[in-house]
A protein has these predicted regions:
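Helix-terminus/linker motif at the lipid-water interface of multi-pass membrane proteins
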Residues: 23, 27-45, 113-120, 176-187, ...
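Single conserved hydrophobic/aromatic residue that forms the stacking wall/gate
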Residues: 1-8, 13, 341-345
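Membrane-interface helix-loop junctions in multi-pass transport and translocation proteins
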Residues: 157, 168-204, 337-340
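Residue-level signature of transmembrane alpha-helical cores of multipass secondary-active transporters
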Residues: 14, 18, 55, 95, ...
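Membrane-embedded alpha-helical segments of multi-pass transporters/permeases
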Residues: 34, 103-107, 171, 175, ...
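Interhelical loop/hinge segments that connect adjacent transmembrane helices in multipass membrane
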Residues: 8-10, 14, 189, 193-196, ...
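Small-residue-rich hydrophobic transmembrane alpha-helices
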Residues: 44-103, 107, 140-154, 158-159, ...
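Short membrane-interface helical motifs at transmembrane helix boundaries
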Residues: 101-131, 330-343
Length: 346
């Protein structure tokens, strides 16, 4: 009974900041959609089409980096604290390689949209938005790798505070660039994408500054091995990367299907695409909340695995199922109004 109570409380401690961070991230997308949708329905279609490609380009490398979270959590649970910093540094180098690869792929946005059979208008405007989006990939991966490390060492609130601040920044910057206020040019969907880029740069700078502050603290630096980095990092991180392969494949399957359906919606025109964007926007928020619960579960399970606690693994897994099911049942009862997204009756 005591173990059940401990696992439940640990799940709540882990889940609260991680879920809050994911909800805030989902809200950022909802706010972007509302601002652009109320500005112009066609612009909403362009940003939706660009995002359907972009979501694949940035979630695949995030899936590949998931091993950092799991392996670092295992080491933390086994009280091998210095190994967590080594895994973080390996992930930092790995994320740099992934950023180059997926940014170069994304720059070819117009070519990708043309190959998918989109009309010239969608290719031109959707490609412009996608080009802005892809330049945020390096900053996303810097943030994600550092945040995975901090979550694994029981510092999930750092990411939560960052994403809340990022939401506030986005609410201020987004309408200014979309509508062209205070002397800024009116950029529409490109302005919203630019705001997203600015916010992601802020997140990367914020979380890396926190890590740097930890490094300057001799006690924390030594405890977590933040200076541990070797020329053999590629071979050393083989098992960590292997964990990410399966998660990346799952990501391709889920987000790939979303991109395919988005392509179909794009073929049917701007209004159909805009409607599809609103529908996906809401469902994505629900998915991100459930995904955050799974992340919290994986951390607690990995900690239990690291200390050889089989009963703790089972208890944490069951707690994750219960919390997820309860959350889903609660969320599906929530109704939303499309008028929040656009005033276009069509």
């Amino acid at each position: 009974e005591m173990l059940r109570s401990l696992v439940g409380s640990e799940m709540c401690i882990r889940d609260r900041p991680i879920t809050t961070a994911f909800v805030a991230m989902g809200l950022m997308g909802i706010i972007d959609t509302m601002i652009v949708g109320n500005y112009n329905t066609d612009q909403l279609a362009y940003i939706g089409l660009a995002n359907s490609i972009f979501v694949v380009l940035f979630t695949i490398p995030i899936g590949l980096l998931q091993g950092v979270l799991i392996k670092s959590s295992q080491k933390f649970g086994a009280h091998k604290f210095q190994s967590t910093g080594k895994i973080y540094n390996e992930g930092r180098k790995y994320s740099f390689i992934l950023a180059i690869v997926f940014t170069l792929l994304g720059i070819q946005g117009e070519t990708i949209l043309r190959l998918l059979g989109q009309d010239d208008d969608m290719v031109k405007h959707g490609g412009e938005v996608l080009r802005v989006f892809v330049f945020s990939i390096p900053f996303i991966l810097m943030y994600v790798n550092a945040n995975f490390f901090l979550q694994s060492i029981r510092r999930p609130y750092v990411g939560m505070y960052g994403i809340i601040a990022a939401n506030i920044l986005n609410i201020i910057v987004n309408p200014v660039l979309v509508y062209g206020k205070f002397g800024f040019p009116e950029l529409g969907a490109v302005g919203s994408a630019t705001s997203t880029l600015i916010v992601r740069i802020f997140l990367a700078v914020y979380i890396l500054a926190y890590i740097r502050r930890m490094k300057k603290n001799p006690k924390l630096n030594k405890r977590f091995g933040l200076d541990r980095s070797y020329s053999t990092w590629w071979n050393d991180s083989r098992r960590t990367r292997k964990i990410g392969y399966g998660i990346a494949i799952m990501t391709i399957a889920t987000n790939g299907s979303f991109s395919i359906v988005s392509t179909f919606a794009g073929w049917m025109g701007q209004h159909t695409m805009a409607t599809f964007v609103i529908m996906i926007n809401v469902s994505t928020l629900l998915f991100m909340i459930c995904f955050s619960i799974s992340q919290a579960t994986s951390i607690v399970v990995a900690n239990a695995y690291g200390r050889g606690d089989r009963k703790g693994i089972l208890m944490a897994t069951n707690a994750g199922y219960v919390i997820s099911l309860t959350t889903i049942i609660t969320l599906i009862t929530i109704l939303y109004s499309c008028l929040l997204y656009t005033s276009d009756a069509a």
